[in-house]
Every structure is written in C-alpha cells, then in structure tokens.
Amino acid sequence: FILRKTFFLSIIFFLSFSFLGIAQNDQDLIPLKSMAPDGIGPLSLPHLRHMVLGSAFVYNGDCPDLFIAGTGKTTELYLYKWLRNTENGVPIFDKPHKIASPFKLKGTIFQTDDHNVHALWLKKDSVIHTVFNLKKQSFDRIGGIELPELASLPQSIAARINKDQSVDLFLELVGHSIPAKYANQNPSSKEWRPYDEAGVSTTPLHYTYLCNIRYPRLLSGTPSVKQMVTHSRKETRWGMMNIAMVTLRKNDMQELICGSRLGNFTYYSRPELSQDTLSPRHYVVGSDNILLQHPSISASVCSYVDVKSGTTNIIAGGEGAVYFYKYSGEFTLDGHPVFSQPSPVLQVDADLYCGTLPVPSVIDWDGDGIEDIIVGNSDGHVLFFKNIGNNNNPRFIPKGRVQADGKDIHIQAGYSGSVQGTPESRWGYLSPTVVDWTGDGLPDIIMGDITGKYTLYVNKGTRTEPKLDAPQPF
C-alpha cells in the first residue's frame, strides 16, 4: 500500500506541476519517460500551451526544423531539430533546445532565400525584426518599425516575401465585438451569471479580421496600407491565435491559413502581386469534406513544407499536443483545402505525455497483476498507459484513448456546459477514478468533468480485455 501510495502521489505531483510550466527541482521530480520503441512519443514541452511560430532549414536537413513557444506560468522559445519522418510522413524531432530571444510570443518565423531565419515580433504598434544566430542559439535584434495607424493593436502577424522582393505583412485586428450583458461580473462571485433566462450566453464576444501592409522591401520603404483585406470584421470568433503563409496551389497565389481559439482553420487566397481583398473565407476540411477541428483549444498554426511536392503541410499547437496535418493536394469543389486528420508530431527521448492538466488513476487495468495508469485531461479524453515493467520499476507505453460503447471517450463543455460560460466550450477537464463499482471484479470508471456532472462507465468486458459500456449519469 505504501509503495502504491508513493507511486500514485509522485505521478500526481509530476503531472500536475510539469504541464503547468511551473519550475521543477530536478532532484525532486523526474519525468516519466515513454517506453515506446526508440523512446518516440508526442512532442511536448513543460508548459500549459504550445504556440507554433514557424519552420526553417536551420540544420540543413532534408525537412525543416521547428520553432515552438511554450506558455503558461512561464514562456520560453524552443527549437526542434528534424531527424526523420515516419512511414506516413509525420516528422520526428530531436529533444528541444531553448532559444534566447527578446520576444517569445506574438511573432512569426520564416526563412529567406539567403537561408537567414528571420523573426518579426509584435510590440504594441511596432514590429521588431530579429535574425537567428545559430552559434549563439538566439534571435538577435537588428531593427524595427512603427506600424501605420490601424483600427486596433495587431494580435498576430505573418510575412510574405513576393517575387519582386516586396513584403506583405498580414496583421490580425480586433473587429466586431459584443459586450457582456451584465457589467462587473466575476466568475468567482455569487452574482456570476454566464447565461441568461433564455440560456443565451452573457459573456463578451469578439471577432478578428485581417489587414495588409505592403513594404517595397523587408520593413523598409513607404508602406501601402489596406485596412481590411477580409470580407468582414467578423471572421474568427475569439481570435486567430496566429497566421501561416502556405503554398497549396503553386500558381503565384498568396495563401494563408489562420488558427483559432475554437480550433477551426480558415483559408484565404489572392493573386500574388495584387493588394486586393482576399477570397471569401474557406475552411480546412478532411477527406469527408467535414471541417477539421484541432483536438484542443487555442490552435496556433505554421506551414511545414513538403520538399517533394513543394506544397505545404501544416503543424498546429494548442493546449495539448502538437499535431501534423498533411495536405492532400486537393480542394473541394467549393474551394476548401483538404488535409488529413491530425497526427501527433513526434520526438525522440520523449516524456510520457498525457495531455494538459492530466488527472491520473493508478489501477491494474488489463489484469496482468501490474499497475497501469488511466489519465483524463483538459482535451476531454481518457488515455491508457500500460506498465510493461513492474510495480517496483514501472515502465509505461501509451496504448491510446479509452473507449466506451465502441467510441473514444470525448467530453467537452460545448455552448452551455461550463459554469464559466461559452469561452470554455472546448475544454473537458476529465477526472477519472477507476474502481470496481459493480463488485464483479472488473474495473469501472467514475468520471467527473467540466459540466459538473458525474457519470459511471461500467466494464462489460473481461479482466484482461476491458470494454466500457455507454456512460450512465449519477
């Protein structure tokens, strides 16, 4: 019992603190490593959220390397060196290296034909220009400009160098807004009312849109400003997170894919040298023509070139793992680009990644006499990690998402499921407790989640092959 309790508490403390980005004492907390073949597992940082900022051929490999910022209690910028791809084309990266930079968020990273890696950072109404120094592993400031007067402070930025060496900056601005119905409310107060009598959200709502500034050269010369290049000021609810320049059609087009807080990806295009309004908003879809939605909230996005085709795939981060979306080379008849379903981006020597805000339950799940881990997370999934070691020396491999009634368990708040209101719609906050509730010798799951409800998942399988039934509310 003492061993189990100590092991369980160690997991609780490690998972709770490491994924909040709280500084750790290496002597106190040792991350559990993935025991998957070659130690390969989902790319992850000890932070609450992953913000992908760009890719570039830093180490002259066959595929680009990746820049990611980790945010939470602390914010740091990291560089991942590309090592190889899986058979399905998913990139595998080396362990992350921390990068020094005067700024770490609200930026875009791109590479020019001279192989220099640039980063442009937003600082209120200015853009700061830095260049990557490989030897120093840092972005060094080389200049900056004050932006022309815009309708709002920019929220994110992307840069495109055109064939005539002019440079287009695309900036995300705050557009249409709806104030809160009730003033001076705090979610911690007894007066808090996230929904009115009709069940309609009372929380504030805002949308963002794109503007365009063209410079004759990179941040130099007299700019040409187009205050709005989208068809409305109501393009993306609660923000785009960031903007990626992509190449899908390969016919002298400017193409953009934007992330979003809710996890959808929007697509825009126009002829390269025009400064016309972008095409109407389209969405990234799957092969079934259904919109792709990132597995977690706050999806940031960057382009990731396919060196064989010359087109770009995308990599997206958020509050959870970082995912790879492969471009199919096709558009739907009505103009939506088709991408694959997301696959986790991988790294070597990976820590055991359970998602953000994991809640573990230690149990012998598969009846082999060795204690495994069942984990719920903020994405709204439940994961199974099998112990291939023993209880004195546990070694875990990820075995995927736990299912109920033949489907992955996936719970999120939706429009009205959170006491904090609709901004929490993409969170699940699953808290599984594994226990033999029915007394038949099989482990069942009692689940708490963001909705405040508790549900029971009865195990109708066998001791060695658990099979959960559909959930039953308490």
Where do the PLM segments sit?
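Hydrophobic beta-strand segments that make up the repeating blades of beta-propeller
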Residues: L66-T71, V117-K123, L169-E172, Q254-S260, ...
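Post-signal peptide N-terminal segment of secreted/secretory-pathway proteins
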Residues: G54-F57, C63-L134
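Exposed, low-structure sequence patches enriched in small/polar residues
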Residues: A316-G317, D364, I370-E371, V375-N377, ...
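Short, conserved, GDST-rich strand-edge loop motifs in beta-rich repeat architectures
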Residues: L171-Y207, Y267
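Bacterial Sec-dependent N-terminal signal peptides
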Residues: F1-D26
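Beta-propeller blade termini
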Residues: R49-F67, F103-H118, L153-F170, M240-R249, ...
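Short glycine/acidic-enriched loop and turn motifs that connect beta-strands
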Residues: T71-T75, K124-V127, G175-A180, R261-F265, ...
